[in-house]
Regions:
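Alpha-helical transmembrane segments of multi-pass small-molecule/ion transporters
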Residues: 1-223
Length: 223
């Protein structure tokens, strides 16, 4: 996951980052379709949109399971039963997934270029605000819990970066890219990359202080 790479670059607790990604991804298999269907049904406009595109809850859940659940199970099984193979494949798959995400986002932006002006003027400010709030929430929660700098960096990045690839896949699969929604998810992904790289660049120049009320076992951040 790109958040794990950003955490590693920021000299944060990569082990905590990976653990949080795993837990949130497992929860997202169920919570993502349920949240979309629940909140969209509360608004008359979006409720009509759900009926228009004929969203089936079980189909939505199945798509999320296929996108998130199956790759995760395969990855965990590989690492557990064939650890050497898992270690060998880790870096190539990280590079491939990053390149795929960039290509996926680029394709969505190109296909929905006609909505780009509207996105920049009407939606981008909310994307930036949402991301800033998430950064503050992650950092603030870590401080309240008195976590070390290593853990604070991991939590801040994990809370503030979201799975745009999942969003794009669901939009294209379930909504056919309706109304430029793919551009919204793609733009979200671009901004998260920008803010994530900025955080990593800031923290990379500063040694993390180990002091804190709690510190989760971490991997070597100096590798």
């Amino acid at each position: 996951n790109i958040s794990n790479l950003i955490t590693h670059m920021a000299r944060g607790n990569t082990a905590l980052s990976i653990s949080m990604t795993g837990v949130s991804s497992l929860l997202a298999i169920v919570t993502t379709p349920l949240n979309i269907l629940f909140w969209a049904a509360l608004n008359p406009d979006t409720n009509a949109l759900l009926r228009q595109v004929s969203i089936e809850p079980l189909s939505f859940l199945g798509s999320t399971m296929a996108i998130l659940g199956i790759p995760m199970v395969l990855g965990l099984a590989t690492v557990h039963y064939w650890p050497r193979l898992g270690h060998l494949l880790r870096r190539p798959l990280q590079i491939m997934s990053f390149l795929f995400l960039v290509a996926f986002i680029g394709g969505a932006i190109f296909t929905n270029a006609r909505y780009l002006t509207v996105f920049v003027q009407s939606i981008l400010p909310f994307v930036v605000l949402h991301n800033a709030i998430a950064i503050g929430l992650g950092w603030g929660t870590a401080k309240v819990l008195r976590l070390s700098d290593y853990d604070t960096r991991a939590m801040t990045i994990e809370v503030s970066m979201h799975n745009s690839g999942l969003g794009l896949a669901l939009i294209l699969n379930q909504f056919d890219g309706l109304g430029g929604a793919a551009l919204v998810a793609a733009g979200w992904g671009v901004w998260h990359l920008i803010s994530g790289w900025a955080l990593a660049a800031w923290w990379k120049r500063r040694d993390p202080h180990p002091q804190g009320g709690s510190q989760v076992a971490r991997t070597d951040t100096a590798e």
